[in-house]
Amino acid sequence: MRGAGPSPRQSPRTLRPDPGPAMSFFRRKVKGKEQEKTSDVKSIKASISVHSPQKSTKNHALLEAAGPSHVAINAISANMDSFSSSRTATLKKQPSHMEAAHFGDLGRSCLDYQTQETKSSLSKTLEQVLHDTIVLPYFIQFMELRRMEHLVKFWLEAESFHSTTWSRIRAHSLNTVKQSSLAEPVSPSKKHETTASFLTDSLDKRLEDSGSAQLFMTHSEGIDLNNRTNSTQNHLLLSQECDSAHSLRLEMARAGTHQVSMETQESSSTLTVASRNSPASPLKELSGKLMKSIEQDAVNTFTKYISPDAAKPIPITEAMRNDIIARICGEDGQVDPNCFVLAQSIVFSAMEQEHFSEFLRSHHFCKYQIEVLTSGTVYLADILFCESALFYFSEYMEKEDAVNILQFWLAADNFQSQLAAKKGQYDGQEAQNDAMILYDKYFSLQATHPLGFDDVVRLEIESNICREGGPLPNCFTTPLRQAWTTMEKVFLPGFLSSNLYYKYLNDLIHSVRGDEFLGGNVSLTAPGSVGPPDESHPGSSDSSASQSSVKKASIKILKNFDEAIIVDAASLDPESLYQRTYAGKMTFGRVSDLGQFIRESEPEPDVRKSKGSMFSQAMKKWVQGNTDEAQEELAWKIAKMIVSDIMQQAQYDQPLEKSTKL
């Protein structure tokens, strides 16, 4: 799917010809390998250091323009790799104030406690869902059930078009500069021709993968260019000026195609001679292909989602549609990369307001949460920034007598977040009073809930709170780091193997089962409500059978998963009290004034078990004595006598109370 991002298993060599949306992922992948140095030219081109923006820009330009000197590229890359490695080692060096002796009983601080850890994988925003390849398929499935999947797909394709278009425009600009430099009267170089042909082949391969290679046809296929251009223009309802611009650009493309095909033949035409003698010709053809791919992608997106005769058009106005047409067919003949940005914002708002809240409550999101919780890589941030998971974690911390650590972290983090949100525009005295509440509770020598911080941390907090102008938003950073590290290293592993964690999983699984049963019934009955009740469809039985089999298979998978984690439902589910094996059958009855349950309907005679003959019953009574029923009956008689005696005494004392009141 376009827009979902490149696959994590793609190698850097396959991503190298494309300088567009894969570059950000490529930089992340190369970050862990910045220490390695190879002699391969392609590997050195791909190894872009994330610590040096100048190096990243330069290598990006080299990838697009393909400079002639590979030796210079090797030298520059090696030097900047060594510089980045030394700078990274300096940054990773632990400062003097972060030594182990600085921290108290809560353990050593976590140096990775940064802003990126304030996000939980279990609670997502719509923007995070659209950029996360794990939860995005669940959201698409949810939208497919609502027949609104075209909104998600349009947003993804428009986002991909926006990023790739800017990268292609940058490549076009670099090739234009390179073409102007090569246009000077210099003797042709074989090295230039090899480099340009390599870039042309690489671009052709990338455009074939993205579905845009249909514009770059051979001479035999170039006959249908005018027909396809006319159909595209009619479908887009473009103006006459736009038609002329399209035809002009396509004629240029056909001329470039003729030029490429004729270069392979042994002819003496003027076009062939000019192509062989000018090293700028392949770069000019490359730039033309880049701009053609932008135009074709814009046309495809418009045809699928914005055109009036699209299968599932997005909800936009006619004025917005005309604006998009004007941006695609600009006066200068270029496509605006931001032509779909406004439509993206409309679609994003529609998904957020009408569908996303329901998705968070659906079993699709529960399935995603189960996948995260069972992946084996659950972090503390996933628990602390998710309300449902934080509830179970707080119960676990309370059982471990460490809930004060969690409460301090929540209170201090909330305090710092509120101060940071005000951006310095807050009352210093009020902030100091709030900070003193936390200090008196957790840090002072007379603290009500001491956490074990040492004197160094306590003095640091005192100086941060009592500063002139009030405390800063980072006044509790050091104890927050210690509390975070303690919960992460000491309590999180125990929580992930506790019964409360399995109860959390069990609740999610039960919610998925219930929603699947309800959703399955609705999906099976909804198609039948469209037509008359007596109308039968030949394929309805097959579809219902397939849907029921799929539902049973999914439930079986969840059942096996439930058994695999070994959840003791008797100790976790309160409803199990009503499912005891030794509990008697439920019967109708009433409770008397004395608290005795009196049955209103006795079981049928044949249901009662045979107690044997009269002789056997007499022998049992003689051997065992009175039965339980007889003893219970005698106890009720005694209770009635006691209650009646008390009632008589109360009625006897009642006239005296009335006389005293009078």
From Swiss-Prot:
Chain intervals with Polar residues compositional bias:
261-280
Recorded GO molecular functions are: protein kinase A binding
Annotated region Disordered: the residues are 1-55, 261-282, 524-548
Record-annotated RGS domain positions: 125-369, 379-505
A Gene Ontology biological process in which this protein takes part is: protein localization
Q: Where is this region: PKA-RII subunit binding?
A: 634-647
| GO CC term, one of those recorded | cytosol
Which Pfam family, any one of them, does this sequence belong to?
Answer: RGS
The keyword Ribonucleoprotein is assigned to this record: no
Tell me where in this chain the PTM Phosphoserine is found. S52, S189, S281
Q: Where in the cell is it found?
A: Mitochondrion; Membrane; Cytoplasm
Q: Where is the composition biased (Basic and acidic residues)?
A: 32-43
Glycoprotein in keyword set:
no
Transit peptide located at which residues? 1-28
Q: Which UniProt keywords apply?
A: Cytoplasm, Membrane, Mitochondrion, Phosphoprotein, Repeat, Transit peptide
Query: What function does this protein fulfil?
Result: Differentially targeted protein that binds to type I and II regulatory subunits of protein kinase A and anchors them to the mitochondria or the plasma membrane. Although the physiological relevance between PKA and AKAPS with mitochondria is not fully understood, one idea is that BAD, a proapoptotic member, is phosphorylated and inactivated by mitochondria-anchored PKA. It cannot be excluded too that it may facilitate PKA as well as G protein signal transduction, by acting as an adapter for assembling multiprotein complexes.
Entry remark concerning the domains of this protein = RII-alpha binding site, predicted to form an amphipathic helix, could participate in protein-protein interactions with a complementary surface on the R-subunit dimer.
Q: Know the name of this protein?
A: A-kinase anchor protein 10, mitochondrial
